[in-house]
Amino acid sequence: MASRRILSSLLRSSSSRSTSKSSLIGSRNPRLLSPGPAHGAAPCGTLLGRVAEYSTSSPANSAAPSSAPAKDEGKKTYDYGGKGAIGRVCQVIGAIVDVRFEDQEGLPPIMTSLEVQDHPTRLVLEVSHHLGQNVVRTIAMDGTEGLVRGRKVLNTGAPITVPVGRATLGRIMNVLGEPIDERGEIKTEHYLPIHRDAPALVDLATGQEILATGIKVVDLLAPYQRGGKIGLFGGAGVGKTVLIMELINNVAKAHGGFSVFAGVGERTREGNDLYREMIESGVIKLGEKQSESKCALVYGQMNEPPGARARVGLTGLTVAEYFRDAEGQDVLLFIDNIFRFTQANSEVSALLGRIPSAVGYQPTLASDLGALQERITTTKKGSITSVQAIYVPADDLTDPAPATTFAHLDATTVLSRQISELGIYPAVDPLDSTSRMLSPHILGEEHYNTARGVQKVLQNYKNLQDIIAILGMDELSEDDKLTVARARKIQRFLSQPFHVAEIFTGAPGKYVDLKENINSFQGLLDGKYDDLSEQSFYMVGGIDEVVAKAEKIAKESAA
């Protein structure tokens, strides 16, 4: 009991002293009060002093008037303070550059772009950290070779801003919006910052709607959602580039929309090949007809520093957002490869000294990817539908990078080498490709039942292939023989001549309407075309062309 009385008296003594001190300090400057460490040593020791000060400072803090929340609280805004201020480089570590400013008024906010002065080439830095002592840590958007301490750096007072609008169609830009196709500057009056908020919830379109591509296998079995995100899986040489170009062409013709291709960590050779193929196929037009081009390209090549590769996806998305929001377009955004986006952010995170997370990835993996993916959506004005090529490291689907990406996808389109070896193009695997849109509540009973019927026939054929390889077709039952015959016709009917491949194949491209597509495959499942040969189903558009081709083959064989 005696010890309790002593402790109680000590607390009262400390409280009275702290209260008197607090009132004195508070009368001079009430803002100096905080529930932090004691202003002076308490006679009863550090712990009792902290307890006493906390008990006395809390009422003072609660009495202070609470500031009203800002009108746009939670919304990302940019304080353009410090524009024109000059800092100096004080440290260079690879792609990370530290810059010191003279005073706090010239200090740039996070995500502000800075430009190095008196440098042989334009070098832009993006502010990432405030280190204290008026020093900011930045990420370089280009190589830092030749950069030395003491070099002047200009605060632009704005984030990285890139040109947008129709002037970008048919052009190739880098992460900063600078043209890299040697065709002169991009003349436009419209510019937007690459760091922007996702559309507000009230601006989003709530309905689910198919984006018709005119490609039979996609529209029937793995339809794309308007404003959705599609993962494109495929190795080299299976027709990924041709499929991308056909999607660009068909969306432009059917919906009047534009496309944006963002090469993230792209091989320079592949980027150049894509550009040349787009010119040959008419997706991009040069000279006086440039305004008729259907696609803008934004490249951050594999040899670029990690800062550029981490931001080039945002640059491409910003160009697409302008077409959606300002022009009300249905835009296709291609990102090749979304894994390289994650990889580049991981490199930047390591350079900034963050502690790595699982498998060495950055601790902000989910938020980095989410900031990009949440901006890809449908609004009441227009839509951005994204097709993202995905590299899976060591074919491990549980790797954090692809696993985080899968959570955002609405559909997957898998290109199969086995199907391409059969000469069936597009080589989309009808059994591995999936879509959230494949539901009777969204597509309707007719479309859903036809799609599931086609998949059932193809799956049964796949199960019978081992028996056929060992025993031959003669050992199958009549029902199984009919299943095999229909499955082989369906396989070939899923092939389709592309508009962008006309210059290679000589066959005119075909755009197949969704309703015609469903009716054609339903007729196949019902056995209406069992008497037609397999060959007549290969590389045609609708079922009418199949019948016409079968008649032509019959006449040629009769002659």
Curated annotation (Swiss-Prot):
It comes from the Eukaryota. Residues 1-54 form a transit peptide. SMART domains: AAA. Belongs to the ATPase alpha/beta chains family. One of its GO terms (molecular function) is ATP hydrolysis activity. Its EC number is 7.1.2.2. It comes from Arabidopsis thaliana. Transmembrane segments: none annotated. One of its GO terms (cellular component) is mitochondrion. It catalyses: ATP + H2O + 4 H(+)(in) = ADP + phosphate + 5 H(+)(out). F-type ATPases have 2 components, CF(1) - the catalytic core - and CF(0) - the membrane proton channel. CF(1) has five subunits: alpha(3), beta(3), gamma(1), delta(1), epsilon(1). CF(0) has three main subunits: a, b and c. Keywords: ATP synthesis, ATP-binding, CF(1), Hydrogen ion transport, Ion transport, Membrane, Mitochondrion, Mitochondrion inner membrane, Nucleotide-binding, Phosphoprotein, Transit peptide, Translocase, Transport. Disulfide bonds: none annotated. Residues 1-28 have a biased composition (Low complexity). Mitochondrial membrane ATP synthase (F(1)F(0) ATP synthase or Complex V) produces ATP from ADP in the presence of a proton gradient across the membrane which is generated by electron transport complexes of the respiratory chain. F-type ATPases consist of two structural domains, F(1) - containing the extramembraneous catalytic core, and F(0) - containing the membrane proton channel, linked together by a central stalk and a peripheral stalk. During catalysis, ATP synthesis in the catalytic domain of F(1) is coupled via a rotary mechanism of the central stalk subunits to proton translocation. This is ATP synthase subunit beta-3, mitochondrial. The keyword Transit peptide applies. The lineage of its organism: Eukaryota, Viridiplantae, Streptophyta, Embryophyta, Tracheophyta.
